[in-house]
């Protein structure tokens, strides 16, 4: 599954990552990390912006949606509409029900504790960030010198 997702990243012209609440923080983290290695990526956390973004997706788009419960309406709406327009869509959720398979290219099952979405014991972002680290490492490894060069260039830009 990770290999397929990295393949989607390699082929996408544009990547959009969305999530609300603590999942939105993970979306922003993905944007920052993957931008630094050359991916044209944006993150969205505003409910209205997420819904409106569905209009602009096409077969060259890749959409990542983060929803611990898998039921955040804005996130599922964007993924469903983008999928119907030919985009690749990936839902990250702890809820791996059958209902997801018809609208998403991939459903990444996250490990979970009971009531993880409440965030009162372990950060709800934690399982998302772990899987993002795995995807990041796999993606960088496929073309290490170019990706590391891009990362170094972003460091230089920050020092200017």
Identify the residue ranges that each predicted region occupies.
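A short, well-structured juxtamembrane/interface segment
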Residues: 1-11
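A short, charged, Gly/Pro-tolerant segment at domain boundaries
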Residues: 145-160
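Glycine-rich phosphate-binding loops that contact phosphosugars or nucleotide phosphates
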Residues: 10-130, 134-143
